[in-house]
Amino acid sequence: MIRIAIPNKGRLYEPTISIFKDAGLPISGGAESRKLFAKTTDPDIHILFARAADIPEYVQDGAADVGITGIDLITERGAKVETLLDLKFGKASLVLAVPEDSDFQKAEDLEGRKIATEFPEITHQYFKKHGVNVEVIKVSGACEMTPHVGIADAIVDISSSGTTMMINHLKPIETVFSSTVYLIANKESLRTKEKILDIKTALESVLNAKDRRYLMMNVPESSLQAVKEVLPGMSGPTVMKVESSKLPGESILAVHAVVDADLIFTIVNKLKKVGARDVLVVPIERIMP
């Protein structure tokens, strides 16, 4: 059995549920039902709901074989786990922020000052790298209030949009750490449980497909070379003969290719100009690596 620890709430919960569904491993039930455990469509893969901050240690200690959580939390805990895959969601930054009416402009301006944070290890390492001596004060929440009540001169805290800091009259002056969500594994489990790599492959296939589209078109044989020059594709387009052509005496070919989504507008217009017709653009659910 493989036990996967995933966030039980917060901004990481819904994207995690979604990517498992897209990967063909939908989770039955959810944390909203107050359950600690859930099943997937694979009887050998079970889900454990946990606080995102606790998941690195759960995986390190073997309570879970696999986990999904932010790389910031993994780094802060110093967890001895294998990082398998950047899932590319849950993007956030740990920022150094000061009161908006202060004169602090950079980390060096905070020599000898107090810094409040929920990430003391990352914060300590950041200031050490800059050669700045500060007093790091660990807090468990409401970090934004600490400069306004005299507890700290600045904070290091997670910022996704900057709205919360703006509301609390704080201004970011430096980015301390950039984070996304990662798939991690227990070292021993990874060595002994082959299905962990199957899970990685399934999730990776969703990421591979996310920003790509499948193009299908009919092309006169005389235009094939021009069409091939337009299409970047993954490993060149697939070309097949169309048995029934509406144009007597002219062979029609079906051409299929996978292209980046942000190139679709440009590529389709170029294809039409060189003779492609009946162009279809289709979403891709998964591309297996």
Swiss-Prot record:
Residue intervals passing through the bilayer: none
An annotated GO cellular component: cytoplasm
Annotated localization: Cytoplasm
Alphabetized Pfam families for the sequence: HisG, HisG_C
Protein name: ATP phosphoribosyltransferase
Primary role: Catalyzes the condensation of ATP and 5-phosphoribose 1-diphosphate to form N'-(5'-phosphoribosyl)-ATP (PR-ATP). Has a crucial role in the pathway because the rate of histidine biosynthesis seems to be controlled primarily by regulation of HisG enzymatic activity.
Cofactor entry: Mg(2+)
E.C. number: 2.4.2.17
SUPFAM superfamilies, per database record: GlnB-like, Periplasmic binding protein-like II
InterPro entries: ATP-PRT_HisG_long, ATP_PRibTrfase_cat, ATP_PRibTrfase_CS, ATP_PRibTrfase_HisG, HisG_C, N-reg_PII-like_a/b, N-reg_PII/ATP_PRibTrfase_C
Keyword entries, A-Z: Amino-acid biosynthesis, ATP-binding, Cytoplasm, Glycosyltransferase, Histidine biosynthesis, Magnesium, Metal-binding, Nucleotide-binding, Transferase
Activity control note: Feedback inhibited by histidine.
Any GO MF annotation of the entry: ATP phosphoribosyltransferase activity
Reaction equation(s) it catalyzes: 1-(5-phospho-beta-D-ribosyl)-ATP + diphosphate = 5-phospho-alpha-D-ribose 1-diphosphate + ATP
Pathway: Amino-acid biosynthesis; L-histidine biosynthesis; L-histidine from 5-phospho-alpha-D-ribose 1-diphosphate: step 1/9
One GO term of the biological process aspect: L-histidine biosynthetic process
